[in-house]
Amino acid sequence: MIRLVAVDMDGTLLGPDGRVSDRNAHVIRCMQNMGVELLICTGRSYEDALLPLEEAGLKASVVCMNGASTYDVRGRRIGKVELAGTQVEQIVECCKDADVIFDFMTDKGSCTIAEEEAFKDYFNRNVLLPMAEFSYEGVRRRFTFLPPGELFERGLEFYKISVIHESPLVLDGLRERLRAVPGLAIASSAATNLELTHQEAQKGKALAEYAAMRNIRRDEIMAVGDSENDHSMLSMNLKYTVAMGNAVERIKKTAKCQTRPNSQDGVAYAIENLVLPYAINSE
């Protein structure tokens, strides 16, 4: 019997409009009423992960920023893994000649050292790929724009850094350079970004730690995702690892099975077929 369902957000639980569909929300509530836990595993910050959950009337524990921070269902932080200051310095140095946009996720929210005009241009050309439910002004309000010289003067704790560029080829080159940074995990959630965390801050590791705290075995877990930053949890030896129908090929090859795309309530379909029948029979 499945006791824990770990679900990515963007491209997975959320539809193309950036919202939890009525069907997904209904099926998740049915699952929770049967005693099965929902664990959100997302690249978003905790605050940004809560927005669509609250809109849908759902509550869940949340692994955020690709595993850099974990919150329980009451909103209490129960785990965090920061990037070291030397890692952040090396990341900035590796990317300094590539004309990238940085999104630094910190204990004080998101900040960037980009010029605002360049930032807005990337948004307007769909390079920034913000959360679908946000307008430019909504995204702009999330960020503090810092002069480059102030980045290391504010005593910030860095949890995740997104490196954004319109050219996948440029990002491929940066990925190779960044491999030289010790202890760095490199993932991606889109063709125009790299997502950087400490190597101990990955969705799979955070999922394993959460399950251990809850005394849930790996054969009692189902995980669902769509992009490269879900690989660490979909490559785990769980009862079910499920790729969305819209998932990238690497994820489809990694997962044990495949569900419908996020535009067709793929999370609900997976839960209805792999979780609810057995939860019902166990009552």
Give the positions of each predicted feature.
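Mg2+-dependent phosphoryl-transfer enzymes with acidic/Ser/Thr/Gly-rich catalytic loops
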Residues: 1-4, 15, 20-21, 179, ...
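Hydrophobic packing residues within well-ordered alpha-helices of enzyme cores
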Residues: 24, 49-53, 174, 251, ...
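Short, hydrophobic/glycine-enriched beta-strand segments
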Residues: 3-8, 40
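Residue-level signal for inorganic ion chemistry
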Residues: 31, 42, 66, 161, ...
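Conserved acidic, metal-coordinating active-site core of Asp-based
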Residues: 94, 98, 105-224
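Short active-site oxyanion
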Residues: 35-39, 59-60, 160, 219-221, ...
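Active-site phosphate-binding/coordination module
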Residues: 22-127
